[in-house]
Amino acid sequence: MATHVSAVDDIVSEYQGLEAQLADPDLHNDAARARKVGKRFSELQPIIQTNDRLNAVTDDLEAAEEMAHEDQEFAAEAERLREEKEELSDKLADLLAPRDPHDGDDIVMEVKSGAGGEEAALFAGELVRMYQRYADKHGFAIDVLDDAPTDLGGIKDITMSIRSKKPSRDGAWSVFKFEGGVHRVQRVPVTESQGRIQTSAAGVLVYPEPDEIEDVEIDDKDIRVDVYRSSGKGGQGVNTTDSAVRITHLPTGLIVTCQKERSQIQNKARAMQVLAARLQQMKEEEAEAAASADRAAQVRTMDRSERIRTYNFPENRISDHRINYKAHNLDQVLDGDLDDLFSALQSAERAERLEAE
């Protein structure tokens, strides 16, 4: 408990400092710094609010216990306050527990169809719609940076930016990070005339997005920028100039494309953001692997080459193989109802982090 008190005191001091900065008009002349301060303020706010409520309940409980000897109504009130105090103490401990430093971050997500041809592309499209529906329900905004649709409405590959609509302690990374890996589907494809169940797959890659490109060192001589004409199905939204951008990072071979913005400058800026996110992720994973070479699995990330989840349509079943999670509500999950699954994954990650401390 003493450790919690010390930690909260430090957070209260930091929170008050951030509050003073946000009240300073000069801060808002520097948009990047203002975003960072606002983001950190939002991350600390739930801790401050929970701690304030816990202190108030503790004071009320002491008063109620003193009066309980004379009035039975206060005895009942004291019992209620004891329960609330215990709940708040548990909540505060959870808020103070070790957490992923990127949990408040926006993300870049890539979804790619795997083995299975057109059926795999259709499944990749369903995964994208599942994420879009979840995002709509939970205050996230999705921007498509680049995509390659198929004739039947599937997706060969797509790159998206997923952002919180307002600063939050729990950003897009806090939930979508669990999606990195191979997703397998079992069902009768629409193209299958014999009614046989087939298996196909789609791969998902997720990267936390740096607050600023400048946070990641990218040397101009290490990149090659190519421009080309944007593709599309026609209409006013299609660019008629060479505005699409492809950036190749020469040392790593990473290639990033963006064609959804209205100008070449905007497409290059967004492509650089995606490249920065991918390079940051590579650097962190290399450092983490070196620091935890004696462990079979990393704490923060799952192996992106492994099969993490199976979507079984005949049984309406979804299975997450990392935590032995099974549920027969696949139809609801594909409609964006991922709350139970994400909650189970977050609990497992939290337990693993506490064990590693």
UniProtKB/Swiss-Prot annotation:
InterPro entries per UniProt: PCRF, Pep_chain_release_fac_I, Pep_chain_release_fac_I_sf, Prokaryotic/Mito_RF, RF-1
Endoplasmic reticulum is among the record's keywords: no
Subcellular locations according to the entry: Cytoplasm
PANTHER family hit by this protein: LD18447P
Assigned keywords, A-Z: Cytoplasm, Methylation, Protein biosynthesis
Protein name as catalogued: Peptide chain release factor 1
In-chain residues carrying the UniProt-annotated modification N5-methylglutamine: 236
Primary subcellular site in the record, as a coarse category: cytoplasm
Gene name as annotated: prfA
MF terms (GO), sorted A to Z: translation release factor activity, codon specific
Record function comment: Peptide chain release factor 1 directs the termination of translation in response to the peptide chain termination codons UAG and UAA.
Keyword flag Magnesium: no
HAMAP family linked: Rel_fac_1 (MF_00093)
Family to which this protein belongs: Belongs to the prokaryotic/mitochondrial release factor family.
